[in-house]
Amino acid sequence: MNQDQLKQAVAQAAVDHILPHLDSKSIVGVGTGSTANFFIDALARHKAEFDGAVASSEATAKRLKEHGIPVYELNTVSELEFYVDGADESNERLELIKGGGAALTREKIVAAVARTFICIADASKLVPILGQFPLPVEVIPMARSHVARQLVKLGGDPVYREGVLTDNGNIILDVHNLRIDSPVELEEKINAIVGVVTNGLFAARPADLLLLGTADGVQTLKA
């Protein structure tokens, strides 16, 4: 199977996993990116079986609405049973790097609210140590230089992502050459830098379930 077929397989597996738990009042948290888009397409075939969705980005909200799935603001939702999203990297503890699509802050907020965070990815995303994929950091624009200097002190090589503004109006620094042996500790350190909104490490709140698309089918990993 090619990469898109693997993504489709894990997207369908996620739908199959959550469907038995959904009812007419259920609201599903939905992530951002190419794998999440396959999940939206698969979920849309069952839109009569749940109430609606919370989107982690404007792009996701648009795709959900195009499928006729009602989109709710997170502040109006009292509970969220599931959040389903992709990842740029995952280790075996289901600590993730996310944010390649620049939606990391809203993704992290929705993941924090959800009772169960299901990550869907193809097998290439599972790595022994996080950090080969550059770590995205969302930054208040006026703090860009200050934050970059602090990231260098942590051993990283930050690169400004040209031409990208997040849905929150901020910029992204992609931090290269980090060997992330202690993801929870590094997540906290970077988030403590003044001017950082958040970073793409999902370690303090990792995924609960990883559905991994492989040539031999979908594998399920639990934290």
Swiss-Prot record:
- GO MF annotation, one: ribose-5-phosphate isomerase activity
Purpose = Catalyzes the reversible conversion of ribose-5-phosphate to ribulose 5-phosphate.
Catalytic reaction list: aldehydo-D-ribose 5-phosphate = D-ribulose 5-phosphate
For this chain, the family text in UniProt reads: Belongs to the ribose 5-phosphate isomerase family.
Which keywords does this Swiss-Prot/TrEMBL entry list? Isomerase
Q: Where is the active site?
A: E107 (proton acceptor)
Spell out the SUPFAM superfamilies in the cross-references.
D-ribose-5-phosphate isomerase (RpiA), lid domain (SSF75445), NagB/RpiA/CoA transferase-like (SSF100950)
Q: What is this protein called?
A: Ribose-5-phosphate isomerase A
Q: Give me the residues that bind substrate, please.
A: T32, G33, S34, T35, D85, G86, A87, D88, K98, G99, G100, G101, K125
Report whether Transmembrane shows up as a keyword of the record.
no
Q: Identify the Gene3D superfamilies for this entry.
A: 3.30.70.260, 3.40.50.1360
